[in-house]
């Protein structure tokens, strides 16, 4: 079996044990074959692998929770599960994806890239808030894909709820077209009955016009009520209206405290109101007569019954005479209502003031309680200090008398120092105020004192020092900019160097490309072999056809005589011998190829066994290494 060349390493011999790492690929001086380049990078890649595995499990759980149960199939690859789940989520969110995922598994890298681009286009149409690139999908970057799949599952659930509501409404509407629920039927009957009742009430009690106003008369609310026969109800006042009037006058006199002025104002208002009402009644009487002259008796009977017409004529005939007294009664009642409203407003205002006073009292009460609590705490503290001093005095003995005296002297010294510190602070503050005043006085002096030669020399020195410092600052800024440029160049160079995770991705990508190229090479060889086989078959069929044509053309001539027949038979024997030789060669070649195929199959099975054994031994070795690390850790803890 021809060994495939590696695209990663220069030395591809079987005894080279460093083909698993990327030392010769990276060309770094600190990395040597057979050793790990950097322990921190190894730990980082291991942490990334653990986190990626955890995110992969969470993605599968999210897809199953969302309803994509195909992710439970253990025979599918992670790419098919994750990308299939993403496509299913996008389709379930009512967004189309131009890809066929359900009948094509284990795609090559070109199909994966095209599929990833279609998914990214669909996510952009959905306005996904998370950035995504095609390499994240093809290389299965689970850490980047996890928030996107979580967002897609939430979209699926929202779309499912919306479609569920729409389907529920549609089913209810379709049911309502052919059937009616018992509750709806009872409600419809009661609604129809109530509507009929309301219509009958509206028809019975609707307002009807009973009189007509003159055209040259100005429209007022009172005249409009009179047209519809509503004003006559105002005349039906209770018999005790005088009593109410007297009570209102008494209440007004008690509130105002001015009997004479209140009465005069009320009498004047009453007289004015009586005059206005009399004038309006006279106009309405003329309008009534005019209306009676224009409206016929039959039309009026159609509006009102005969008894109602008689009563109205009697009432409105006497209204001109009784209009002043009734108007005064109405005015008194109106004034009474106004006084009541004013009293209610005054009561409401006083209540608000009372609430404000109560709130202020409660605030003062809380402040008083806080002060009482503070005083109680101070008193308790003083009592505790007194008790402690009494205890200390009781504990005083001839042995510790000197120590207590020394302690008392130290306490007194501390208190005196504190008092001196306060006095010193106060004196410093006073001096600071005095110095500030002096400085202000000096600054407010004449400008001639500022033009002294010494001050000018000092200003020149300060200016020179300032200029020199500015020059130094510029030089330092130039050096800093140069250092920043160097740092940025080094940083850019370091950024261009691939990390171990990127190198692992590159290696995986190169391996996939190598596998794809080898599969294409195998496929091309199969095409060539098939073509050669068909070409040989075509040649044999052409030879057979030519032989059959020659036999057919010479058969009649050969059968004409015995000599020709013998020659014909000999030529046929030669042809058969040639065909037999070709057949023998083909059989020998087929046998050789079969033996080679069997040998290669045996070698392949042997290699598969070795691979299984290698993976098993590697796993056992890792387990033993882990146990060894645990034992070393425990040993270190015991030491």
UniProtKB/Swiss-Prot annotation:
Which chain positions lie within coiled-coil regions?
Answer: 332-492
What does the record list as GO biological process? Answer: Golgi to plasma membrane transport
Q: Which UniProt keywords apply?
A: Coiled coil
User: Which cysteine residues pair off into disulfide bonds?
Assistant: none
Q: Which domain of life is it from?
A: Eukaryota
Q: Where is this region: Disordered?
A: 250-275
Which Pfam families does UniProt cross-reference here? CCDC93_CC (PF09762), CCDC93_N (PF21673)
- Where do Basic and acidic residues bias regions lie? 260-275
What protein family does this chain belong to? Belongs to the CCDC93 family.
PANTHER family on file: COILED-COIL DOMAIN-CONTAINING PROTEIN 93, FIDIPIDINE
Protein name per its UniProtKB record: Coiled-coil domain-containing protein 93 homolog
What species is given as this protein's source?
Answer: Dictyostelium discoideum (Social amoeba)
């Amino acid at each position: 079996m021809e060994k495939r060349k590696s695209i990663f390493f220069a030395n591809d011999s079987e005894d080279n044990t460093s083909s698993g790492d990327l030392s010769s690929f990276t060309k770094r001086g600190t990395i040597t074959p057979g050793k790990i380049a950097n322990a921190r990078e190894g730990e980082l890649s291991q942490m990334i692998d653990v986190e990626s595995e955890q995110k992969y499990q969470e993605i599968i759980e999210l897809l199953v929770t969302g309803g994509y149960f195909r992710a439970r199939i253990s025979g599918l690859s992670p790419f098919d599960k994750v990308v299939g789940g993403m496509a299913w989520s996008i389709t379930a969110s009512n967004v189309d994806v131009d890809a066929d995922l359900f009948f094509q598994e284990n795609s090559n890298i070109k199909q994966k890239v095209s599929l990833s681009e279609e998914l990214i286009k669909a996510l952009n149409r959905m306005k996904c808030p998370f950035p995504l690139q095609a390499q994240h999908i093809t290389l299965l970057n689970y850490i980047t894909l996890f928030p996107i799949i979580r967002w897609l599952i939430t979209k699926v659930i929202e779309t499912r709820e919306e479609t569920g509501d729409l389907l529920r409404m549609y089913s209810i509407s379709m049911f309502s077209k052919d059937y009616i629920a018992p509750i709806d039927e009872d409600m419809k009957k009661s609604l129809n009955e109530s509507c009929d009742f309301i219509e009958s009430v509206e028809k019975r009690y609707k307002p009807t016009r009973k009189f007509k106003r003159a055209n040259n008369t100005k429209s007022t609310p009172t005249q409009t009520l009179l047209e519809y026969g509503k004003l006559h109800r105002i005349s039906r006042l209770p018999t005790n209206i005088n009593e109410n009037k007297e009570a209102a006058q008494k209440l007004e006199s008690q509130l105002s405290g001015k009997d004479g002025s209140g009465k005069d104002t009320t009498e004047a208002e009453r007289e004015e109101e009586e005059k206005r009402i009399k004038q309006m009644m006279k106009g309405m009487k003329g309008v009534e007569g005019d209306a009676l002259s224009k409206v016929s008796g039959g039309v009026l009977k159609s509006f009102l019954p005969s008894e109602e017409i008689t009563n109205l004529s009697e009432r409105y005939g006497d209204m001109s005479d009784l209009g002043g007294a009734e108007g005064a009664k109405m005015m008194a009642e109106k004034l009474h209502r106004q006084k009541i409203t004013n009293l209610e407003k005054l009561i409401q205002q006083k209540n608000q003031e009372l609430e404000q006073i109560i709130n202020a009292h409660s605030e003062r009460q809380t402040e008083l309680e806080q002060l009482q609590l503070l005083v109680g705490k101070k008193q308790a503290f003083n009592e505790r200090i007194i008790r402690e001093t009494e205890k200390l005095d009781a504990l005083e003995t001839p042995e510790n008398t000197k120590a207590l005296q020394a302690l008392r002297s130290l306490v007194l010294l501390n208190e005196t120092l504190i008092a001196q510190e306060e006095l010193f602070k106060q004196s410093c503050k006073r001096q600071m105020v005095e110095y500030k005043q002096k400085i202000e006085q000096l600054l407010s002096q004449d400008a001639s004192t500022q033009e002294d030669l010494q001050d000018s020399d000092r200003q020149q020195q300060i200016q020179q020092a300032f200029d020199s410092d500015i020059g130094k600052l510029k030089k330092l800024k130039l050096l800093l900019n140069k250092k920043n440029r160097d740092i940025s160049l080094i940083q850019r160079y370091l950024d261009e160097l691939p990390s171990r995770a990127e190198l692992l991705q590159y290696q995986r990508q190169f391996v996939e490309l190598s596998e794809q190229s080898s599969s294409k090479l195998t496929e091309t060889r199969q095409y060539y072999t098939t073509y050669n086989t068909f070409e040989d078959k075509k040649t044999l069929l052409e030879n057979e056809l030519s032989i059959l044509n020659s036999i057919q053309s010479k058969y009649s001539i050969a059968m004409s005589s015995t000599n020709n027949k013998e020659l014909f038979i000999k030529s046929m024997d030669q042809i058969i011998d040639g065909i037999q030789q070709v057949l023998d060669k083909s059989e020998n070649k087929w046998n050789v190829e079969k033996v080679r195929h069997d040998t290669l199959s045996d070698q392949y099975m042997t290699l598969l066994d070795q691979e299984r054994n290698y993976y098993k031994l590697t796993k056992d070795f890792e387990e033993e290494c882990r146990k060894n690390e645990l034992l070393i850790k425990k040993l270190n803890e015991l030491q």
